[in-house]
Structures are given as C-alpha cells and as structure tokens.
Regions:
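Conserved ABC ATPase "signature" region
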Residues: 67-68, 104, 108, 115-132
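ABC ATPase NBD coupling module
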Residues: 13-18, 69-85, 109, 114, ...
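ABC ATPase "signature
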Residues: 222-223, 231
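Conserved signature/switch motifs of ABC ATPase nucleotide-binding domains
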Residues: 136-139, 157, 164
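Helix-to-loop junction immediately C-terminal to a conserved catalytic motif
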Residues: 52
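Short coil-to-helix segment of the ABC ATPase nucleotide-binding domain corresponding to the Q-loop/switch region
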Residues: 97-104
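Helix N-cap at the start of a conserved alpha-helix in ABC-type nucleotide-binding domains
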Residues: 173-175
Length: 334
C-alpha cells in the first residue's frame, strides 16, 4: 500500500545542512495499523509528511497504492491526497464552523453537492459517535470530541490511508484509549490503512500491528510489535522499552552474567521460574527487572536475570527446557 524507498530529507539551516531522514525504506501493507515511534527529533513527523508530499524528500521514492507520488502532475497529486488524509495533535478545526460544516469542508472543496455532503457528514458523525454534535461549535467540545470531529472530517473523501501525527499527544490517558479504540474500529470496518506517529510506547502497544523505531533520522529497528517490544535488538529500541534504564543496570561481571528471558504466552508467564531454579537446582538468581504486558492482543512477559557465573550454563540449560521461553544473554554496561 505504502512503500518508501531510500528516503532522504535535508533541511538548510543557518549553521548548514541538517539531515532529518537518512536512507529510510519501509513497506506498509494494505489494512495495517503501522506505528512509527522515536524520541523527539528522530524524524517521525518529517517522515509522515513525506508520505503525502507535504514535505518533498531530497531523494528517494514514495509509492502509494502502486503510484509514485513525485511523478504525478499537480492535478493527479491533489486527487491522490484525497485518498491519503491526516489528523494532527491540535485538531485544526475551523472554529467559526459547526461540527457538521467542518466535516463538510473537504467535500465542498472536492465539488460535492451540498445535500450529498451534508448526508455524508451526518453519517460520519454517527460513525465517530457524535451524531448529536452536528450543530455544536469546536469550542463547545472536549479535546477528545474535537479529535473525533477531525477524524470524521479526514474520512469525508473516503480515503485509503489515514496518517495520524501525534494525534493523541494532547489528550489524557482515558481519552487517548477511546480515540485509539475508535481508530482501530475504523480500520476494521473500513479496511483503511493507518500510520501512527507517536513518541508514546503505550500507543503502539495498544493499536499497532507493526512498528518502526526511528533514531536520528534512520530506521533502527522494525517488525511486529510483539517481536520488537518483547526483545528489542537496537540501542534505540532498548531505550524505549527500558526507559528507566533497567536494561543498563550494572552488576559485577566477575560474579554473574545476565540473561533476558522472553515469555511468549500467558501460560509461560505464570511459571515460577526463579523459584524452581532455587528449589530444583539450588541456583539463586538476581532478578534485575521483570514485567508482563499485552502486545498485539497477546500476553508477553520479560525478565532480566543475573545468574552466578559458576552456575550459568546449567541455569540456561534448565530454562531452555521450557517451551516458549526465549533466552538471550545481555552484555554488561559500564
């Protein structure tokens, strides 16, 4: 559905050129909810704006639904953008228009008849759960309600792709959850491809099928959400998954070696592994960190253990006897 090939973007600044994107290549399949996550300044918003040519890349190719955007005429690009809509952090509603007129606006620009536009707008207000707000003004709505109106407006032209640039960053956690559930429901009902730009791991965990981690304008890691967040392989991924630094805690390498265990289903997360190591093998481990989380609607657990050097091989052999537990040795950080 969306294919980015070797995208680079350079901005001119007073001090010289700044590389915002460096050879980024991604493929997003039709109907996916795809997350792009990274710290501030990683290049996330620049990347999503390249997907509809709000930002033109310095080099590289952007393909959407089998068409290369940069080779389109101005008229063809306008038509293509009706199928690649976008919502933002700050809603961008027209404050002097009612909610109904806000949703009608893109249809008016497309030349749709007024009666047809209003009928479609009312259907969309129903779809996003606000049929009673047609005559209300944006200032009369909560932040979550304003974002629902923005989503309805984005769907007005029956797009194939919905780009969400930090769409929940200005919302409280409960409202964020509600908006994410709405986006997922629309994805399932309409088959629309969704790209989520965020710096919040919780957003990606809740809604996305796949994720790419951006770091310094480059793709540090990508794949299924469950695989990337259960066992991040890149330094950028580890910073996101272990924001408190649990992955970098120092233990004495002369005394113990560390392993990360990934429990890949709800049954294995319930195994009292450390207790069994102590009871059955007389091996006493240092639990550095442990967590259980839901990723892509499945339960995963992770544990970082310090195992005495003298018993390391025997402990790893014992753990590997359990199915669905992945064992990975972790280097010490100084």
């Amino acid at each position: 559905m969306i294919e980015l090939k070797h995208i680079c973007k350079t901005f001119d600044s007073g001090g010289g050129e700044v590389e915002a994107l460096k050879d980024v290549s991604l493929t997003i399949e039709k109907g996916e909810v795809y997350g792009i996550i990274g710290m501030s300044g990683a290049g996330k918003s620049t990347l999503v704006r390249c997907m509809n040519l709000l930002e033109r890349p310095t080099s590289g190719e952007i393909w959407v639904d089998g068409q290369e955007l940069e080779k389109m005429s101005a008229k063809e690009l306008r038509q293509a953008r009706r199928e690649i809509t976008m919502i933002f952090q700050h809603f961008n509603l027209l404050m002097q228009r009612t909610c109904l007129r806000n949703v009608c606006f893109p249809m008016e620009l497309a030349g749709m008849k007024k009666d047809d536009a209003e009928k479609r707008a009312r259907e969309l207000l129903e779809l996003v759960g606000l049929p009673d707000k047609a005559n209300a003004y944006p200032a009369q709505l909560s932040g979550g309600q304003q974002q629902r109106i923005a989503i309805a407006r984005a769907l007005a032209t029956q797009p194939k792709v919905l780009l969400c640039d930090e769409a929940t960053s200005a919302l409280d956690p409960n409202t964020t959850h509600q908006i994410l559930q709405l986006i997922r429901e629309l994805n399932r009902k309409l088959g629309i491809t969704v790209v989520i730009i965020t710096h919040q791991m919780s957003v990606v965990k809740e809604i996305c099928d796949k994720v790419a981690i951006l770091d310094g304008g480059e793709v540090a890691e990508e794949g299924l959400v469950s695989a990337v967040f259960a066992a991040p392989k890149s330094a950028a991924g580890r910073r996101l998954v272990f924001p408190g630094g649990a992955d970098a805690l120092v233990s004495d390498p002369a005394e113990e070696r560390r392993v990360r265990l990934i429990f890949r289903d709800s049954q294995t997360t319930g195994i009292p592994l450390v207790a069994r190591l102590a009871a059955e093998e007389s091996i006493y481990c240092n639990v550095i960190s442990a967590s259980t989380q839901q990723l892509s609607r499945e339960v995963y657990g992770s544990m970082l253990l310090g195992i005495p050097n003298a018993h390391f091989d025997r402990a790893v052999e014992f753990i590997k006897a359990y199915p669905n537990i992945q064992v990975e040795e972790v280097e010490h950080h100084v």
